[in-house]
A protein has these predicted regions:
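Short, flexible helix-loop junctions that flank or precede catalytic/ligand sites
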Residues: 1-258
Length: 258
């Protein structure tokens, strides 16, 4: 039977961005923007369930049984890191796997953003455009240049970040803190100077981010959008603010959009 390590290694060597695993289908990968079958036989329902659920620990398996989906990041020595989303598909586990490529340093023209000490800094773009890698590189640049305490609230933790001169506390939702709100409630007790919230795609995450800005912190986050105006509009819609003032208030809080 095919192993996860074999699949992930082949897909990565082929330059894939994502891997798809479904019962009754050959393993597939998105390569150069197109989905292509990998050179493996179709997965039976039994094989799909076995190889996917074996990646979960007891807590994650319990979450999957309850909610029918779970996210995790796994690493294989000599291969790399992968963000795995396992979900139920016609009664059988399926998975979409994002290959976490090695992050590159922040481009020279963006390094000045590492000096921002208060307000919202958004990284926007389409899915698979490298938002998470850019966000991690920006956080690393901030920590390299000054003494600060940066707390991350992520679900799950994706890219490694070097603490540099600063202090870094990485908190995974569901593992290190119960929710974004709970993580935010603890920020003052942790004497944080900044917070990285991986994905600003839910009301809870957005409201946590805006609350941190009001506390005087610098807040880093990603938004699935094609441009700055759409990103701010998306944040405004999820903010819970009164409609007439939503967008104006969010723009005032926003220091930069990448």
């Amino acid at each position: 039977m095919v192993t996860i390590e074999q699949l992930f290694r082949q897909a990565q060597q082929a330059g894939a961005a994502e891997i798809y695993l479904m019962a009754g289908r050959k393993p597939a990968a998105r390569i150069g923007g197109k989905i292509k079958n990998l050179d493996y036989p179709e997965l039976s329902s039994t094989e799909a369930e076995k190889i996917l659920l074996e990646m979960l620990d007891a807590k994650q398996a319990a979450q999957y049984r309850e909610t029918k989906s779970v996210d995790e990041v796994i690493a294989f020595h000599g291969i790399g890191r992968f963000r795995v989303h396992i979900y139920q598909n016609d009664g059988v586990p399926s998975a979409c796997v994002k290959i976490i490529n090695k992050k590159e340093g922040l481009p020279e023209e963006l390094k000045a953003l590492a000096g921002i000490t208060q307000g919202l800094v958004l990284v926007c773009g389409k899915p698979h455009s490298g938002k998470s890698a850019t966000l991690a590189a920006l956080a690393e640049q901030m920590l390299a240049g000054r003494f600060m305490h940066l707390v991350t609230l992520e679900s799950p933790v994706e890219y490694p970040i070097e603490a540099g001169k600063g202090l870094l506390s990485r908190r995974c939702i569901g593992k290190d803190t119960g929710s974004y709100k709970e993580g935010m409630d603890n920020l003052l007790h942790e004497s944080a100077d900044g917070v990285l919230i991986g994905e600003l795609e839910t009301p809870e995450a957005v409201q946590a981010a805006l609350r941190a800005v009001k506390m005087g912190l610098v807040v880093l986050g990603t938004v699935n959008s094609v441009d700055a105006d759409t990103a701010v509009e998306r944040i405004a819609q999820l903010s819970g603010m009164e409609a007439p003032l939503q967008k104006t208030r969010v723009w005032k809080m926003t220091k930069a959009v990448i």
